[in-house]
Amino acid sequence: MTAPHETMSFQAEVKQLLHLMIHSLYSNKEIFLRELVSNASDATDKLRFEAIANPALLENDADLAIRIEADPAARTLKITDNGIGMSRDEAIRNLGTIARSGTKEFFQQLSGDQQKDAALIGQFGVGFYSAFIVADKVTVETRRAGLAADEAVRWESAGDGEFSIDAINRAERGSTITLHLREGEDDFLSSYRLQNIIRKYSDHISLPIRMPKEEWDAEAQQQKVTGEWESVNQASALWTRSKSDITDEQYQAFYQHIAHDHEAPLAWTHNRVEGRSEYTQLLYIPARAPFDLWDRNHKAGLKLYVKRVFIMDDADQLLPAYLRWVKGVVDSADLPLNVSRELLQESRDVKAIREGCAKRVLSMLEAMADSEDEAERAKYKTFWEQFGQVLKEGVGEDHGNGERIAKLLRFATTHGDTAEQSVSLVDYVGRMKEGQDKIYYVTADTWVAAKSSPHLEVFRKKGIEVVLLTDRVDEWLLSYLHEFDGKQLVSVARGDLDLGALADEAEKAEQEKASADWKEVVDRAKSVLEGKAKDVRVTLRLTDSASCLVSDDGDMSGYLQRLLKQAGQKAPDAQPILELNPEHALVKKLRDLPDGEAFGDRVRVLFDQALLAEGGMLDDPAAYVQRVNRLLA
């Protein structure tokens, strides 16, 4: 079978990525070999997996390996694997387009700062395109396992926006990538240099990486090729080796291989689990959140092996969703080789693995968070900045570990004048005032809005610490986290706020007296706000502000209503309660005004100001401006 010569254009995103890599990754050029070896390893993993159901794909060649060969005379470098290979359509799709989620978001995050962009590009997974960092032309010859020799293809590009594809004859299954090196890249023709890069980045690859064997020629005073091939890596799966035989550098290199992340992980755990389920786990906590963490199509999960045979990437059933950022490998001794994603959802062994992995990850986080070592605590601070919002999901998702997760949460509070989320609930409880039996919090869109909330005034006056919640996930968190250490979590914006022993009898008597004294004014204000406010009353919770809005017990807060509406969901139309500060001049003026426009304007302005103070939106901003202007005139 033959197909015509074709010249095609790269997808626009590929052109952009090629340009970025060539100009942003020049300081770390050697990663191209790591990426190409990683791809070759993946190709052999896929062949092993498909050959379980169809052994004929091995074509009597089960000695899977990667070969790397430099030709100084031709200035070329070849990377060959005998893995699954590609058909013509697969070559066009895999080498000409980026078929993954989050691509648009990735390009939006690029800043022009070479160091930051290099980190992002590495995280995105430069893969095959990294070849163009050192090559001005790349040729790929490939045949998919199971196809005839004349169905092989040659793909070629100079990285200039186009690529050609031709039909060729190729007896060998798999792929050969030939890099035609740019001027000045002769360093990558050195066998010694190539072996160092392989041992640095790819020593853990579980199949042999072979290079032409060289020996010293004493007569010629130089290395010469013997005609044999030798393995230059350990060629054993890292997780199958004893922990005592693995260096930190090897653990980090393996992480970079599976995560496509050039940064070192914050922590890792490597364990062999025996009992009801037998498996090995090697789990990593990354130092940086992936750019598409919040993308609904984000691929999460661990690499799954069964008895050292690769089964699938992104096995998300092996971890609860709130740990979707964890990277690593699970190798099970119990699951069948033909396990499917559907079977994983029903398997008791997988449930045991998921629970075991979750406990190990939480143990790593606890070790960092509770460490006496400042460097370890700094790692937890980094973790929280990157993944804290996702960890909050765990309180509702993982009831069995809910208490452990709650202890790991960090918040901003009124204890410090900073938006940094560094206070644990354990810290908060340890600082509670004598007689305090509740944990108080306020929710808002931003830290500035939270710390400026009128609801905090009485708490500041009494020196009571309040947790400032500003993440979108916080309202969801509160629907599950009702108490901590026996202390109920209470919103300061609740209308029935009870300070218990923190409110003295004199204050309670004063509140009752104010309610009686202001009854006539309050009743008139209720008439003005009929249909907008559920109730109007005076309060002693305010010291500086004239008014605030609170929610009745059992009603949804205004903040949560706004979040639901922003998400396009229907929110119950619960009306707030307007509370007035009887000591504020704007409120006192109400006593002197008869029913009419002036009284109505002042009441509506007090309501609208309270709504704005909590981050709400006015139904009619123009009318608000007119009322304020009339008050100022």
Swiss-Prot record:
Residues 342-562 are annotated as: B. The keyword Glycosyltransferase does not apply. It is found in: Cytoplasm. InterPro entries: HATPase_C_sf, Heat_shock_protein_90_CS, HSP90_C, Hsp90_fam, Hsp90_N, Ribosomal_Su5_D2-typ_SF. CDD domains: HATPase_Hsp90-like. One of its GO terms (molecular function) is ATP binding. It comes from the Bacteria. GO terms for cellular component: cytoplasm. Residues 1-341 are annotated as: A. The keyword Chaperone applies. Keywords: ATP-binding, Chaperone, Cytoplasm, Nucleotide-binding, Stress response. Residues 563-633 are annotated as: C. Molecular chaperone. Has ATPase activity. Homodimer. Belongs to the heat shock protein 90 family. This is Chaperone protein HtpG. It comes from Cupriavidus metallidurans (strain ATCC 43123 / DSM 2839 / NBRC 102507 / CH34) (Ralstonia metallidurans).
